Amino acid sequence: MLTIKHCDRADMVELIGGVLEAQFEIDNGYLLLVTEGNPHEEALYIYFLDSSLEIKDSVELSADYTPGILSNVSMIPPNKIRFSFFDKSESWSAAVLHRPKFHFLGNKYPVKRKHPFLYKSWLEIKKVLNGTQNVGIHRIPAPFKCGIRF
């Protein structure tokens, strides 16, 4: 478990994972990317926290016996990020929707959620097709410190 603390507030949040890899402040909260810290069989956890630091949605990107290294992380304003994980030549995007969507059944492998059937999601995870260009990309720091709690 990873415990993060907002720099300006006393609020703390516990997340699955061990390493806070990237953090972005977006219009309606924060987007956090957390890994286990093991590149040989890695999982990427993507969290959307609202401005009061409540976890509104989370998703796991992982595949059994498959290495994963997070790279090429960039922000596409206002509420989207692009990154590489399993292979540097392929890209993924994670967008925070303006309002949650209801879904029946889960996402396609290797995207995993805690709720396998009917659920409400704020995060939309997609594999980006080749040839799609990044436009207006820049990094926005978010105010979190983290520590591992044993």
What are these regions (language model features)?
Residues 2-4:
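Feature marking well-ordered beta-strand scaffolds used for ligand recognition
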Residues 6-54:
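Short, well-structured hydrophobic secondary-structure segments
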Residues 9-16, 57-61, 100-107:
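Aromatic (tryptophan-biased) beta-strands that constitute blades/sheets of beta-rich domains
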Residues 15-29, 63-76, 109-130, 145-149:
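Repeated scaffold domains used in trafficking and secretory/extracellular systems
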Residues 28-40, 72-87, 127-136:
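Short beta-strand elements that form the blades of beta-propeller/WD-repeat-like
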Residues 39-47, 89-98:
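Structural motif
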Residues 42-71, 75:
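Charged low-complexity stretches with an acidic bias
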Residues 82-85, 91, 102-141:
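C-terminal charged interaction modules
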